Amino acid sequence: MAIHIRNMIKKYKHSIVLDHLDLTIKEGSIFGLLGPNGAGKTTLVSILNYLVPKDFGEVKILGYDSDKNEKEIKSCSSLVPQSYAFYPTLSAYENLEFFGALYGLTGKVLHTKIDYCLEMTSLETYRDTKTETFSGGLKRRLNIAIGLLNSPKILYLDEPTVGIDPQSRSYILNVIKNINQTEGTTIVYTSHYMEEIEYLCDEIAILDQGKIVFHETKETINAHSNIAKIYLSDTSMQEVNLQSNYDALVDTFYNIKQKSLHVKEIELPKNNLENIFLSITKKELRD
């Protein structure tokens, strides 16, 4: 497992932010974390990256105990924060040089890694451009490039597409998929955009009021999202997989006709991610 969390607690004054949280994330997966404002997403990611201390609980990252192996964990993980984390008066290349040096990279190794990070995020043509002139999409891509400098086995991305145009969002999502597929990097992805989570992630969890209240694979969610229920005149009910082939659907309705039954109601599937999210976290607005 990439990450194993058991019984994590975090309090701020009298408020419980993470409440006996348990979570396991598979190595090599793209894991999506959803939650309303104030659910504890950023706090959880901050704890896993040693920005905020936990109050209680056990955390193992790539087999390392987080209380005993901070150096080892930091060397194999990286956080791409929601805010821009680079110097606007420096060029893209100069920023990567600076942050690469902080990781202890020097000489040819450093410059080879910079070229790789620029290529992975398609920033080669902007390498010598001052980043203060970058669009929102370019800034987000540079954030990711910096996050790749230490060749992380786990990459945390906290709302990495906030405030950018749809084309840039789409490009960044494909960059993230490519990082996962080519490097085998475990991705932990937080977002308010459910369509991003559905597109990217192998596993999806919902964090609400400090607890994991939902955790499933995308495959399982999709399987349940394709089942329609047919209520018949004899009070029975049949389920039909809307993703199955045409013959299976024809056979279902043929069998209904052969039994001289009538369809009283067809209930289409409602188990898409948005409906699951709203049903669990409720529909009231949150501050």
Which residue ranges define each predicted feature?
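Conserved ABC transporter NBD signature motif
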Residues: 57-68, 72-73
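Conserved ABC ATPase "signature" region
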Residues: 97, 101, 108-126
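Catalytic Walker B motif of ABC-type/P-loop ATPase nucleotide-binding domains
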Residues: 155-159
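Short, charged/small-residue-rich alpha-helical element at the C-terminal edge
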Residues: 218-287
